[in-house]
Amino acid sequence: MLTTTQDKFEDFEIEKTIGLVRGNTIRTKNIGYDLVASLRTIVGGEIPEYTKMMNESREEAFKRMIQEAQMLGADAVVGLRFGTSSVLPGSAEFLCYGTAVTLKK
């Protein structure tokens, strides 16, 4: 499955626009991560536990979007975007979305 943040591919022509596809996941903070994060705020620097959680969440949302595009018979997703939003205190939604298309050379 090809993906791009652009609205087209240089070497392909969009044959058919299938429509919006998306994937999301909602994650909550971990009490263990919170304790470590609290300590790190004292000394400063990156909080690798949260960085890892953010990366895993983005990957899961991306994977779910790709699965939806494949189920619809798409060859690619154009206009790929990521978003985050707070859902409840201590939790966040990670969203990946774009337009599913079929391609021709």
Swiss-Prot record:
Pfam family, one: YbjQ_1
Superkingdom of this protein's organism: Archaea
SS bonds (residue pairs): none
Annotated InterPro entries: UPF0145_dom_sf, UPF0145_YbjQ-like
PANTHER family for this protein: UPF0145 PROTEIN SCO3412, UPF0145 PROTEIN YBJQ
UniProt family annotation: Belongs to the UPF0145 family.
Name assigned to this protein: UPF0145 protein Mevan_1624
